[in-house]
Amino acid sequence: GRFYRNSLNSGCQVITVREELDIIKSYMTIINIRYNNEISIEYKVDENLLDILMLKLILQPLVENAVHHGRRQKEGKGELCISVQALDDKLMEVSVRDNGVGIPEDKIRLILEGGYKTSKSGFGLHSVKQRVELFYGIEDAVSISSQPGCWTEVRVRFSYKTDG
């Protein structure tokens, strides 16, 4: 129940990086129950960023996409790596990398432009891109790299402030 309470609490637009990661950990607990612990997850997090405020529900849709689209039609154990790093003293980047089926280049363009639709509704990559760009005023905030058949990495960059 904690996953749904945390992720759907609509009273708050921003949360700390730590809280966003807690949502991911709760989500992955549910997923690994469903998929019989077939997905391992590694966190590479700059501890200095844990109390930084960020727009809510940036990482969760990326992880959900990696699990549901990246793992489809792929044999073997799923692997995810979630990274939270400072790019400089004003920009940070969160990323999700999977060892799934990958995405062809033409499909990446469609996803980022909002022209790719799946049968499933909800927060998609284009929605994350729009929300981040609107909230932070950053163009091209989301990028996708992929090697079809091997991996996909989605990176989201945005500005941050530290106290002091």
Question: Language model features by range: what are they?
Answer:
Residues 1-145, 151-155:
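Two-component histidine phosphotransfer core
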Residues 108, 163-164:
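Acidic, low-complexity intrinsically disordered linear regions enriched in Asp/Glu with Ser/Thr/Pro
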Residues 156-162:
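C-terminal beta-strand of the catalytic ATP-binding
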